[in-house]
Amino acid sequence: MITRHNPTQLHNPPGYHHVTVVEAGRLAFLAGQCPLDAFGALVGAGDIDLQIDQVAANAAAVLAAVGARPDQVVRSVVYVVSDDNSVLAAAWRRLTLSVIGSAFTTASTLLGVTRLGFSGQLVEVDLTAAL
């Protein structure tokens, strides 16, 4: 069972929760999902929207491979190569509207970073799901 809470002593966050509680059970820890195609090639060089779409598709495939749905995600960390708040906000919005959008209603962190692992990579998503 998964429950999500916002303590009354804290601000009410837009679209996600401060804490997610999972009753004892199985967890799936996804490796960081990158904007790579099935052959390992970068998708959407220089285009963050195309990269987000690929990351979302990859994450959906990995979740499905272990019998999980996006609404079973209990923790997300999103990395975006930018220090511009408008770019970070746009990336967050696109993810929340993607095929894995419900994964981002849980305990989440959005980080602007200077670089990711692959040359030209602009976004990466790290998810944990309760099965």
What residue spans do the PLM features occupy?
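N-terminal presequence-like segments and the immediate start of the first folded domain
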Residues: M1-A57, A61-V66, D71-V74, V80-L131
